[in-house]
Amino acid sequence: AHIEGRRVMVTGAAGAVGREIVRQLATLNPYQLILVDQAESPLYDVQLELSDHWKNLEVRVLVADVANRTRMEAIFEETRPQLIFHSAAYKHVQLMDDFVSEAIQTNISGTVNIADLAGKYRVSRMVMISAANARHPENAMEYSKRVAEIYVQSSDCRLKRDTGETDMFIVRLGEVYPTNTHCLITLSEACMLTLEVGVMG
């Protein structure tokens, strides 16, 4: 699943992880980057950064909520991504304990939508960005990520059985520097490893 010459979608493209993935993808000569996020101002900042540094790169910027199935299906129908990095999620532990329904809607329903559409539109590879603590969840955010992981795993098994055309992977990212100064891995390094999963599996 080489990136060069391919249409690559990044959900959550305006977040810290998504934005770094976008930066690194831009250096790998994709045919088109499809950037999806519901935060319009940060997404516009990403668009400006790309236009400043990669003037010849074809970029589609789409304001959308991954939990909106109808909107996401229209985006897949129009853009036909070949590779997806699914980074869109709520990640704040304390806030998601206060707004559990939002964690469920975005982290679970949003991931269900992306996984289903990846299979329907025969995307070559989907990489879900999860959280290290999803292994032993203790709060709403971590439980929502774990449920989303299980859905992606089951979708991967089903697609391998039925079509063999879409591979799905999960990458669990922990705390990274400079967000957490006690970490031994930087955000850039974490995203580089994530891209390697997208390319090599």
Question: Where does each model-flagged region fall?
Answer:
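Alpha-helix termini
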Residues: S51-W54, D156-T163, G201
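Alpha-helical substrate-binding/gating segment
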Residues: T181-G201
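Conserved Rossmann-fold NAD(P)-dependent oxidoreductase catalytic core, especially the SDR/UDP-sugar
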Residues: R80, H86, Y90-R146, S154, ...
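Conserved beta-loop-beta element that borders a ligand/cofactor-binding pocket
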Residues: R125, V152-P178, H182
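N-terminal Rossmann/SDR dinucleotide-binding element
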Residues: A1-R80
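Conserved sequence/active-site signature of Rossmann-fold short-chain dehydrogenase/reductase
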Residues: A67, A134, V176-P178
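Short acidic, glycine/proline-enriched helix-loop-strand junctions
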Residues: D45-V59, L83, Y121, S144-R146, ...
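Feature representing long, continuous alpha-helical segments
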Residues: G15, T70, V112, R146, ...
